[in-house]
Curated annotation (Swiss-Prot):
SUBUNIT field: Part of the 30S ribosomal subunit. Contacts proteins S8 and S17. May interact with IF1 in the 30S initiation complex.
Protein name as it appears in the record: Small ribosomal subunit protein uS12
Transmembrane segments: none
Family: Belongs to the universal ribosomal protein uS12 family.
């Protein structure tokens, strides 16, 4: 706790918060072009082949983004929309690709949590 004379000498400093997704530049989403689509292995103790893409954003950044859901149609030069949100077991992956927008197709045959994966409502006969 500072004394009165310490406060007279210099005012209290505001705490500056560091953003968790700097490449978005305070926007909710950003458009970008895939430069490389590949799989990556997670940290211990998990084991898988996670689908990720290297994306060059309109803000000028080049970032690694996760492709959620089962199966995807992305390749080099695909135009994608990115949102923030890290993948805990993939170091350096701080963004998610939004499914069902631009060149990214929604997940096929998805029944639950459809809005998160850009899937259309199933046809009921």
């Amino acid at each position: 706790m500072p004394t009165i004379s310490q406060l007279i000498g210099s005012e209290r400093k505001r705490l500056t918060r560091k953003t968790k997704s700097p490449a978005l530049k305070s926007c909710p989403e950003r458009r970008g072009v895939c430069t490389r689509v590949y799989t990556s292995t997670p940290k211990k103790p998990n084991s898988a082949l996670r689908k990720v893409a290297r994306v060059r954003l309109t803000s000028g950044f080049e970032v690694t983004a996760y492709i959620p859901g089962i199966g995807h149609n992305l390749q080099e030069h695909s135009v994608v929309l990115l949102r923030g949100g890290r993948v805990k077991d993939l170091p350096g992956v701080r963004y998610h690709i939004i499914r069902g927008t631009l060149d990214t197709a929604g997940v096929k045959d998805r029944r639950q949590s459809r809005s998160k994966y850009g899937a259309k409502a199933p046809k009921n006969n």
